[in-house]
């Protein structure tokens, strides 16, 4: 398993505005999309490509094209949906699947409540979108689910991560073809398993508090 923290001044700037509790939901959504596009640029460095023949207005030449089947993008519902536009802006030909997962606030374990994915992911590169890597429970189960369907490799794009969550993923998926791409690794988790300093509940800040 590989962990990559994207070091870029624009990433740091946008993340700072996201952290600010006074940033309203419309601005939060827009900045999330922009930040994800920056993270996706680094996350797709290992995307599979092949040589293709094309013809320019001047002559025939050889270029680069994405290998088929194209990558699969999987946002974790609901907060991961706020990252989807930023990802598909960079990979518009990618297919999109969905995993609905929620955290049990008592056990802190992840519960899968919905999925819309191909049954067979053999040979597919998968990009999982989940803004907060806190305890690691959600991504741990998502990665296990995708590998069970024979995904080739999995890259998880997160806005923030905590050392506890990264270690939990490493314990279960060490040696696996998994990459975690983040804007920042924060100090740790508080007693409610929220990332500190963090940015609060990403889903609530994207869409407002429901229920």
UniProtKB/Swiss-Prot annotation:
The keyword Transferase applies. Uracil binds at residues 195, 200-202. Keywords: Allosteric enzyme, Glycosyltransferase, GTP-binding, Magnesium, Nucleotide-binding, Transferase. Binds 1 Mg(2+) ion per subunit. The magnesium is bound as Mg-PRPP. Pathway: Pyrimidine metabolism; UMP biosynthesis via salvage pathway; UMP from uracil: step 1/1. InterPro entries: PRibTrfase_dom (IPR000836), PRTase-like (IPR029057), Upp_B (IPR034332), UPRTase/APRTase (IPR050054), Ura_phspho_trans (IPR005765). 5-phospho-alpha-D-ribose 1-diphosphate binds at residues 78, 103, 130-138, 201. Its EC number is 2.4.2.9. Catalyzes the conversion of uracil and 5-phospho-alpha-D-ribose 1-diphosphate (PRPP) to UMP and diphosphate. Allosterically activated by GTP. It comes from Renibacterium salmoninarum (strain ATCC 33209 / DSM 20767 / JCM 11484 / NBRC 15589 / NCIMB 2235). It is an enzyme of class 2 (transferase). It comes from the Bacteria. This is Uracil phosphoribosyltransferase. One of its GO terms (molecular function) is GTP binding. Belongs to the UPRTase family. GO terms for biological process: UMP salvage; uracil salvage. Transmembrane segments: none annotated. It catalyses: UMP + diphosphate = 5-phospho-alpha-D-ribose 1-diphosphate + uracil. Its cofactor is Mg(2+).
């Amino acid at each position: 398993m590989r962990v990559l923290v994207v070091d870029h001044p624009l990433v740091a700037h946008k993340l700072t505005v996201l952290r600010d509790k006074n940033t309203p939901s419309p601005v939060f959504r827009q900045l999330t999309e922009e930040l994800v596009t920056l993270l996706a640029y680094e996350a797709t460095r290992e995307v599979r490509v092949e040589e293709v023949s094309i013809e320019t207005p001047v002559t025939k030449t050889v270029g680069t094209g994405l290998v088929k089947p194209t990558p699969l993008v999987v946002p974790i519902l609901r907060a991961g949906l706020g990252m989807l536009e930023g990802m598909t802006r960079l990979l518009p030909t990618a297919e999109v699947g969905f995993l609905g997962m929620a955290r049990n606030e008592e056990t802190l374990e992840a519960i899968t409540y919905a999925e819309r994915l191909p049954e067979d992911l053999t040979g597919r590169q998968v990009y999982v979108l989940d803004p907060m890597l806190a305890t690691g429970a959600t991504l741990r189960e998502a990665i296990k689910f995708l590998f069970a369907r024979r995904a080739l490799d999995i890259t998880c794009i997160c806005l923030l991560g905590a050392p506890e969550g990264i270690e939990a993923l490493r314990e279960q998926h060490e040696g696996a073809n998994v990459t975690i791409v983040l804007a920042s690794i924060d100090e740790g988790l508080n007693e409610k398993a929220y990332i500190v300093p963090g940015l609060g509940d990403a889903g609530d800040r994207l869409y407002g508090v429901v229920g």
